[in-house]
Regions:
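N-terminal glycine-rich FAD/FM-binding segment characteristic of electron-transfer flavoproteins
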Residues: 1-323
């Protein structure tokens, strides 16, 4: 029996998300008294795989197959299911990002396993096996008991943090038979984004809503994000109006993020928006309406016009950086 963690890579490199998964898996394996097995799919160099050892990985399985060169939900779910069966995995851990959300339900069916989605902490108990997760668009918390022999967990991003447990992992190259007919995905064209921090990777996010009043007013917001080393985001109405690209839309129907600092500018704080940002460590709200719902979710608030507040924040950050 083992705890199996699937770590996604991006063009052969791991990100914080991957290290957080390994940290969580190591903690879970310790609770259960089971070995931790980390699975990587695709062409990843040994030097990159060894980085997982810093967070508790001691045994890494590197799976590479022509049928798995392009991500496909069905093919990846089949491959992970085969590895889980071979390793007699009691718990399989994935990220709750788009990839994990696509794979986990399929994996659940293949393994006849109960699924705890969007978990944010280690289990409250292991017998019974009870996990802790947000529910009702982030407005409540739920304790979910998973009763099946095999269990699947998807971990909410930036919810557990990185726990260093350095060691030298063993790396095993392996293969599993994956039917090429399962692969329904083809890549017609690949465009890489360069020079811009990905929203889901950012530890600081500055987000704007309709309170920005016009697409022409985003200069100070973008400048503040750049000064802080963060990313920009927006509410759904803003992206629907075409003020900002849809890739910046956060909320229940957009990207789910959990940065260390989320600055909401001119955003009222509708339930749908808060569902996508409520896992942020610290929320700062700037709004002219002192009764806006966003202030109830925020740790800090400024009641004022964004057009007046943002330039002052920009100047304050510049002064601090120049000291």
């Amino acid at each position: 029996m083992a705890v199996l963690v699937y770590t996604e890579n991006w063009d052969g490199s791991f990100k914080k998300l991957s290290f957080e998964l390994v940290s969580y898996g190591a903690g879970l394996a310790s609770m259960l008294g089971k070995p931790l097995v980390v699975l990587s799919i695709g062409n990843v160099a040994s030097s990159e795989l060894e980085k997982l050892g810093k967070y508790g990985a001691r045994r890494i399985l590197s799976l590479s197959d022509p049928a798995l060169q392009v991500f496909d939900n069905q093919a990846y779910a089949e491959a992970i299911a085969q590895v889980a069966t071979r390793e007699q995995a009691e718990v399989v851990v994935l990220s709750n990002n788009n990839t994990g959300k696509a794979i986990a339900p399929r994996l659940s069916v293949k393994l006849k396993a109960g699924l705890g989605a969007g978990v944010s902490k280690l289990p409250l108990s292991t017998n019974p096996f009870v996990v802790y997760k947000r529910s009702f668009s982030g407005n409540a918390f739920a304790h979910v008991e998973i009763k099946t022999p095999v269990k699947i967990i998807t971990l909410a991003q930036n919810s557990f943090g990185l726990v260093e447990n350095p060691g030298t992992p063993s790396i095993e190259t392996m293969s599993v038979p994956v039917d090429p007919a399962l692969v329904k995905t083809t890549v017609a064209e690949a465009q890489k984004q360069t020079g811009k921090l990905l929203l889901t990777d950012a530890e600081i996010v500055v987000s704007g809503g309709r309170g920005m009043k016009s697409p022409d007013n985003w200069g100070p917001l973008v400048e503040l994000a750049e000064l802080l080393g963060g990313a920009t985001a927006c509410s759904r109405p803003v992206s629907d109006e075409g003020w900002r690209p849809h890739e910046e839309h956060t909320g229940q129907t957009g990207k789910i993020i959990a940065p260390n600092l989320y600055i909401a500018v001119g955003i009222s704080g509708a339930t749908q928006h808060l569902a996508g940002v409520s896992s942020s460590k610290v929320i700062v709200a700037i709004n002219t309406d002192k009764d806006a719902p966003i202030f109830e979710a925020a740790q800090y608030g400024i009641v004022g016009d964004a057009m007046k507040v943002l330039p002052k924040l920009v100047e304050a950050v510049k002064e601090i950086k120049h000291k």
